[in-house]
């Protein structure tokens, strides 16, 4: 089975469009992507959910009525789980949900996520954001010219903070710094747009995993 394929990725430059050849995974493993996304979301969980046991609820430990001769079912204190307002059995306690995922799996997952966008024709590289910096109103015009009309959600990855801040005003755009590129944000958006500096950072991150 062929592991690497050559993808022709469109590059948008001030002088027009060209193509860049890139080596990326030929096969996309959905389960591996799921594993990486699950790992990411587990790391983000706060893990603060907490319930009280019968020993922690604010009730007396006194037996509510005698064991015998009342004609009623036998019970202990009112904090027992069987009563409304009583303690919870096996309820959640604060915990750390994060776990370790091999670095090789994470790198391969990132390469596959980008390759999937390239295979779908939904990966666009940008040579420069000329005239867009410091002009919020210039971003929509640039996006329209690049073929991004807002009908699909876009992940914009660039090291240019001014461009990221301007693009955040568009509700269908998610912005990230190159170092923050991750599988979850790629798969939850429909298109991926990166400048060439971000592309270089991505290539360095995946190393030989493509």
Swiss-Prot record:
<dbReference type="GO" id="GO:0019843">
    <property type="term" value="F:rRNA binding"/>
</dbReference>
<dbReference type="GO" id="GO:0003735">
    <property type="term" value="F:structural constituent of ribosome"/>
</dbReference>
<dbReference type="GO" id="GO:1990904">
    <property type="term" value="C:ribonucleoprotein complex"/>
</dbReference>
<keyword id="KW-0689">Ribosomal protein</keyword>
<dbReference type="InterPro" id="IPR023574">
    <property type="entry name" value="Ribosomal_uL4_dom_sf"/>
</dbReference>
<keyword id="KW-0687">Ribonucleoprotein</keyword>
<comment type="function">
    <text>One of the primary rRNA binding proteins, this protein initially binds near the 5'-end of the 23S rRNA. It is important during the early stages of 50S assembly. It makes multiple contacts with different domains of the 23S rRNA in the assembled 50S subunit and ribosome.</text>
</comment>
<comment type="function">
    <text>Forms part of the polypeptide exit tunnel.</text>
</comment>
<comment type="similarity">
    <text>Belongs to the universal ribosomal protein uL4 family.</text>
</comment>
<dbReference type="InterPro" id="IPR013005">
    <property type="entry name" value="Ribosomal_uL4-like"/>
</dbReference>
<protein>
    <recommendedName>
        <fullName>Large ribosomal subunit protein uL4</fullName>
    </recommendedName>
</protein>
<dbReference type="InterPro" id="IPR002136">
    <property type="entry name" value="Ribosomal_uL4"/>
</dbReference>
<keyword id="KW-0699">rRNA-binding</keyword>
<dbReference type="GO" id="GO:0005840">
    <property type="term" value="C:ribosome"/>
</dbReference>
<dbReference type="Pfam" id="PF00573">
    <property type="entry name" value="Ribosomal_L4"/>
</dbReference>
<comment type="subunit">
    <text>Part of the 50S ribosomal subunit.</text>
</comment>
<dbReference type="GO" id="GO:0006412">
    <property type="term" value="P:translation"/>
</dbReference>
<keyword id="KW-0694">RNA-binding</keyword>
């Amino acid at each position: 089975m062929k592991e690497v394929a050559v993808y022709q990725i469109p590059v948008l430059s001030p002088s027009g469009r060209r193509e860049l050849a890139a080596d990326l995974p030929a096969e996309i493993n959905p389960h591996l992507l799921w594993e990486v996304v699950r790992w990411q979301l587990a790391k983000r969980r706060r893990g603060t959910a907490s319930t009280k046991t019968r020993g922690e609820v604010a009730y007396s430990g006194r037996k509510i009525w005698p064991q015998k001769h009342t004609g009623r079912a036998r019970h202990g204190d009112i904090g027992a789980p069987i009563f409304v307002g009583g303690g919870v059995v096996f309820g959640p306690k604060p915990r750390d949900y994060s776990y370790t995922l091999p670095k090789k799996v994470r790198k391969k997952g990132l390469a596959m996520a980008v390759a999937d966008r390239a295979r779908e024709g939904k990966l666009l590289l940008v040579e420069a954001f000329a005239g867009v910096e410091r002009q919020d109103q210039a971003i929509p015009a640039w996006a329209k010219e690049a073929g991004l009309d807002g009908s699909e959600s876009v992940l914009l990855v660039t090291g240019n903070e001014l461009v990221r801040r301007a693009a955040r005003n568009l509700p269908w755009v998610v912005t990230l710094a190159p170092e923050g590129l991750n599988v979850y944000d790629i798969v939850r958006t429909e298109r991926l747009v990166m400048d060439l500096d971000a592309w270089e950072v991505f290539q360095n991150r995946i190393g030989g995993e493509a």
